[in-house]
């Protein structure tokens, strides 16, 4: 970014036309709080200085759509914590926000060039990715964008080492006034041991080799950067609740998840017909994650070492909670509407919710009677409340289009007796499918 600033300064000094530079960064809403604070401060200074200097530089902080945030998907829909086999977070929270912005910008301007600070030295995967795009370059140093045909990517520092980056940043002051030494200190604090040694050969670790990411990231075994921050600086121990919650998310969770997929289907494990592929988090688990999140928020705010700038840190927004509540109540037909009660218990007065009384088919006492009538059989209870909720939804409709399809979907999802019955049913379906493919006669129980 500093290099691009200097380029625009030179173009301006030569009285040439300067094309606008949009500085975009994506806030996933679960960024490391220290990093998020530094980024926001830098963008504010950048915006002010660019205006004063008459440079067409426009900082833009992008965020995911409310339906695609981490907590709406995990607590709301019950998506399990991301892993290498189900990495649902990156596309929704990082790629789509920038793609939407670039698509809009390129449509308005005809084309756009995306200048990225990606470097080969970051990782072997990054080096392979850059090498691949270099082969596909339409012109020297310009690569086609993966998703957008009228956007090109330019990587000006792709061959720089970590030391090259730090040497430049410490020798060249930031034009917009952010202190690069503060950035060095932040990386130093996130490095194991808290040291930035003088690099004398390739065996010496470089400063800033740590990578900052989302504090909830479970794609790695350990959040080394945040752990190092807490370990190296006693004033950052307030982040410990974040580390603890992140570690809880990373624990084995099969018992916390439904034996059915979101669609209600039961899928057997590839190498074990006695187990089903776990589906979304169970209702109790989702409620527990919300409780843990609000407790962490409360504990952080109570810490006297919390920086003044983030004393009112909010780990989940009102908008996210409203979306989660709608998913629980309308999509999952969890008509006990437990979210406001949980929020009031663990974040009293922090969040406010409109009444859903007009949408309730029963009050909670009647709901309890219904559950008692089902003799605590969760499958029967699911069917009963599901059918009644569908009927409520269509009650005032002159035409009840889709009513019977919704009834059928309720039965398809919950007609099993229990987990064992569901697995037996899936095994029988698999057996029938194999027999049909082989055109063999069926044998077995009726």
Where are these regions (language model features)?
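Nucleotide-activated chemistry modules centered on ATP-dependent adenylation/adenylyltransferase
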Residues: 1-446
């Amino acid at each position: 970014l500093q290099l691009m600033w200097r380029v625009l300064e030179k173009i301006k000094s030569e009285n040439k036309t300067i094309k606008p530079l949009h500085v975009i960064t994506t806030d996933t809403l679960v960024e490391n709080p220290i990093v998020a604070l530094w980024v926001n401060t830098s963008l504010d200074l950048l915006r002010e200085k660019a205006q004063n200097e008459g440079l067409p530089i426009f900082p833009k902080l992008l965020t995911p759509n409310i339906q695609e945030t981490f907590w709406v998907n995990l607590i709301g829909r019950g998506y399990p914590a991301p892993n290498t086999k189900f990495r649902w977070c990156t596309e929704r929270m990082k790629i789509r926000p920038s793609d939407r912005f670039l698509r809009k910008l390129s449509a308005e301007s005809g084309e756009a060039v995306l200048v990225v600070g990606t470097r080969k030295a970051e990782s072997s995967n990054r080096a392979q990715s850059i090498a691949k795009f270099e082969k596909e370059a339409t012109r020297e140093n310009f690569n086609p964008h993966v998703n957008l045909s009228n956007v090109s990517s330019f990587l000006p520092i792709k061959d720089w080492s970590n030391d090259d980056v730090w040497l430049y940043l410490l020798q060249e002051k930031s034009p917009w006034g952010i202190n690069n030494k503060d950035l060095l200190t932040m990386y130093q604090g996130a490095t194991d041991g808290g040291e930035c040694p003088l690099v004398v050969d390739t065996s010496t670790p470089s400063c800033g080799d740590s990578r900052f990411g989302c504090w909830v990231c479970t794609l790695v075994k350990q959040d080394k950067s945040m752990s190092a921050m807490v370990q190296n600086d006693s004033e950052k121990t307030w982040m410990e609740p974040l580390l603890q919650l992140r570690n809880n998310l990373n624990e084995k969770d099969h018992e916390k998840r439904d034996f059915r997929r979101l669609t209600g289907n039961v899928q057997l494990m590839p190498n074990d017909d006695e187990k089903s592929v776990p589906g979304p988090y169970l209702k109790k688990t989702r409620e527990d994650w919300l409780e843990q999140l609000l407790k962490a928020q409360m504990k952080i705010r109570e810490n006297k070492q919390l920086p003044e700038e983030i004393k009112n840190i909010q780990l989940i927004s009102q908008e996210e909670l409203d979306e989660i509540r709608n998913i629980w109540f309308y999509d999952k037909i969890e008509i006990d509407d437990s979210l406001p009660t949980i929020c009031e218990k663990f974040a009293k007065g922090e969040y406010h919710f409109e009444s859903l009384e007009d949408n309730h088919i029963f009050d909670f006492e009647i709901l309890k009677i219904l559950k008692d009538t089902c003799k605590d059989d969760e499958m029967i209870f699911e069917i009963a409340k599901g059918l009644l909720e569908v009927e409520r939804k269509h009650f005032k409709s002159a035409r009840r289009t889709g009513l019977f399809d919704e009834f059928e979907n309720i039965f398809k999802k919950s007609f099993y007796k229990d987990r064992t019955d569901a697995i037996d049913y899936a095994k029988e379906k698999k057996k029938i499918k194999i027999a049909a493919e082989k055109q063999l006669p069926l044998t077995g129980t009726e």
